């Protein structure tokens, strides 16, 4: 049986690892063993942060909606309650986009949500 020489495969494997680690600082971009270890950590961070990014965007959308509805004189949670009662099924991503790009349409949605809300139970009683 012929002898199998693995130098070509080994060099290719190392080259690929070092190419993927090219943006790292110091030894992590130049030494194979350090680069390989850093790549393993990077994959872990990447997996974790792909999940976290979804929550980050949701927080951003909520902040944008909250700022826009407070300008209309209503709080975020009352606005969401009003949307639910009015039967408007827009997600937070679409609402945030409307608040930024089309304030007039967003204002109309806020008015519909306000109209669907019951009377404020925490308002001071009129004498």
From Swiss-Prot:
GO terms for biological process: ribosomal large subunit assembly; translation. It comes from the Bacteria. Disulfide bonds: none annotated. One of its GO terms (molecular function) is structural constituent of ribosome. Keywords: Ribonucleoprotein, Ribosomal protein, RNA-binding, rRNA-binding. One of its GO terms (cellular component) is ribosome. Binds directly to 23S ribosomal RNA and is necessary for the in vitro assembly process of the 50S ribosomal subunit. It is not involved in the protein synthesizing functions of that subunit. Belongs to the bacterial ribosomal protein bL20 family. This is Large ribosomal subunit protein bL20.
């Amino acid at each position: 049986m012929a002898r199998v020489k693995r130098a070509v495969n080994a060099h290719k494997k190392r080259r690929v690892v070092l190419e993927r680690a090219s943006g790292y600082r110091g030894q992590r971009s130049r030494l194979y063993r350090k680069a390989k270890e850093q790549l393993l950590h990077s994959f872990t961070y990447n997996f974790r942060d792909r999940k976290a990014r979804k929550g980050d965007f949701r927080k951003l959308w909520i902040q944008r909606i909250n700022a826009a509805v407070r300008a209309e004189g209503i709080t975020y949670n009352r606005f969401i309650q009003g949307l639910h009662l009015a039967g408007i099924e827009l997600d937070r991503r679409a609402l945030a986009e409307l608040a930024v790009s089309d304030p007039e349409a967003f204002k109309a949605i806020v008015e519909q949500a306000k109209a669907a809300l019951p009377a404020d139970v925490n308002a001071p009683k009129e004498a």
